[in-house]
Amino acid sequence: MEHTYQYAWVIPLLPLPVIMSMGFGLFLIPTATKNLRRIWAFPSILLLSIAMVFSLHLSIQQINGSSIYQYLWSWTINNDFSLEFGYLVDPLTSIMLILITTVGILVLIYSDDYMSHDEGYLRFFVYISFFNTSMLGLVTSSNLIQIYFFWELVGMCSYLLIGFWFTRPIAASACQKAFVTNRVGDFGLLLGILGFFWITGSLEFRDLFKIANNWIPNNGINSLLTTLCAFLLFLGAVAKSAQFPLHVWLPDAMEGPTPISALIHAATMVAAGIFLLARLLPLFISLPWIMSFISLIGTITLFLGATLALAQRDIKRSLAYSTMSQLGYMMLALGIGSYQAALFHLITHAYSKALLFLGSGSVIHSMEPLVGYSPDKSQNMVLMGGLRKYVPITRTTFLCGTLSLCGIPPLACFWSKDEILSNSWLYSPFFGIIASFTAGLTAFYMFRIYLLTFDGYLRVHFQNYSSTKEGSLYSISLWGKSISKGVNRDFVLSTMKSGVSFFSQNIPKIPANTRNKIGSFSTPFGAKNTFVYPHETGNTMLFPLLILLLFTLFIGSIGIHFDNGVKDNRILELTILSKWLTPSINLFQENSNSSINSYEFLTNAISSVSLAIFGLFIAYIFYGSAYSFFQNLNFQNSLVKKNPKKSFLDEVKKKIYSWSYNRGYIDFFYTRVFILGIRKLAELTHFFDKGVIDGITNGVGLAGFCIGEEIKYVGGGRISSYLFFFLCYVSLFLFFIP
């Protein structure tokens, strides 16, 4: 066993040879390298597959042996200071290694087809392979300085990949926004690391945990200083895992290619913050104020992310806010000390969200020939609908991913989310209420995404109806109200120019010619007009979807309880995950062998599933089979004419829509307060520098010049002038002497 662990350091380095080969090829023989560019996908996938096999072998040994292995190289700077570099293999490391490698391989396979026509194909594979290397190095790090080094590499790779299409101004702005926002958290992380180094004189995890176990309980260290340093460490996780209030970069990160969106949201960047907290949880758990703050931030984030996802029309941004909300669940679980539930949800969510993002990429890929290659159109759910007829495999996989995230058994996320909900109710009813309510919202907005994308009729022609005199379907808001002529379309955040009904009953009447166009378009055979239809993607893109579907169906089994004997007349139950995590759980004395009451489990499961089903039902009422409502528009329009006054419910819907679609006005607030404020401060500083500082300096010089000129003309070389001024000076001197 130890012999295998000795070579674990190879895992992060395995993708490097192909990265260096592609880099040198692009610099030295660019033409030949680009001509053979599709060949480079194979070694990238092969080397990461070797890393996956190695990681799987380590994980099996972890489950069977339940041991922690650490190997260090000491680099002595002087007699008083030395740095230690190495790698750490424990249950948390093995879980993250499998997660990163499996999702990374599937994303690479998917990208080979998805990016095949892109000029930056090789550059994309270099970036994404280095992204995987950085994350593998992060999770195997044995101390804080190594974590910070790879932490910054992960941030750099995300910057490069989010701005991959840097010629698009929106993408360039998005990567800068992500970079700057994460710099705030990274600065806090660096200060926290330096603070703990000043306290302990070491950057090793074992020394930090010694503080938690010995010094803090015995008041051997300043608790206020320790709390401050722990808060700074947590700030790094807040930015990297898109927690409130540093979450604003996450939806803009969708400007990158869809495969990298899947990797960022499933196994790399946003998982890094959760990993950091899980790694340092033995330290945080000894600081009650920090734990309460972590759980509070997680609760705010999970609710905020769900509300902001309600009215998004971009399919990828909707999924991005979903990720934000689910990361909030993990943060809440860590804050209440539910280490196992947090990691369980990290695993199940990673595979489900990777499935959803790659499925959305398949949808986007099929829509681009119809609506163009602009993300504003190809990612717009307004122009989708009825795709279940054209992309049945993608539709099936997307539906399973949706139901999993909604918490429907026996899919993966049901088991992990149910455990978090149960633990949150036990910890605090306040957290339990918000987490449970958000579970219903999750089911609502996720099923909304599915219905707008795959249900009803294909609405691709809505983009051309703005000139139709009888009615405009493209100008219908997502909440069912037509955009009036008086709407200010230049509002700083409101880009609402199109949409699909949120409440289907209020859809305006469709003209006859419009209905005919829709009918002929959505009928593949016998259509009068010739159209290009959406089509299923190739096998290279479908294969990762099917593999992720299997993970979504069965990965939840690692958290299912099985009989582990009887103790004190109670049945002890154990899960594969709890056995896997036993060494890590023992670090902070959490009992891995918990007694489970089947009745309590069923009660909690029924309540959580009921909330999910209720959310699905409400979403289906508002969005399901939109074409069936089109047939009753005359009746609905008659009701609207009879009741022209807006009800209180309409006002509430309008407010909720405005809040959700405009991102809670948080970006607007940051723009007004921070961006414009900093610009005004810069202008004021520039004025003070030029007008006051330079003015004083230039004024002194100018005054000296003028005085010199006056003295020059005073002398003139005449003795009479010298005598005159001499007498004047003597007279003044005598006059002022008392």
Curated annotation (Swiss-Prot):
Alphabetic keyword roster: Chloroplast, Membrane, NAD, NADP, Plastid, Plastoquinone, Quinone, Thylakoid, Translocase, Transmembrane, Transmembrane helix, Transport
Cellular component, GO annotation: chloroplast thylakoid membrane
Localization in the cell: Plastid, Chloroplast thylakoid membrane
A Pfam family reported for this protein in Swiss-Prot or TrEMBL: Proton_antipo_N
Enzyme Commission number(s) of this protein: 7.1.1.-
Predominant place of localization: plastid
Disulfide-linked positions: none
Domain of life of the native organism: Eukaryota
One annotated GO molecular function: NADH dehydrogenase (ubiquinone) activity
Transmembrane segments: 9-29, 39-59, 89-109, 125-145, 147-167, 185-205, 219-239, 258-278, 280-300, 327-347, 354-374, 396-416, 425-445, 542-562, 610-630, 691-711, 717-737
Record function comment: NDH shuttles electrons from NAD(P)H:plastoquinone, via FMN and iron-sulfur (Fe-S) centers, to quinones in the photosynthetic chain and possibly in a chloroplast respiratory chain. The immediate electron acceptor for the enzyme in this species is believed to be plastoquinone. Couples the redox reaction to proton translocation, and thus conserves the redox energy in a proton gradient.
UniProt similarity note: Belongs to the complex I subunit 5 family.
Stated name of the protein: NAD(P)H-quinone oxidoreductase subunit 5, chloroplastic
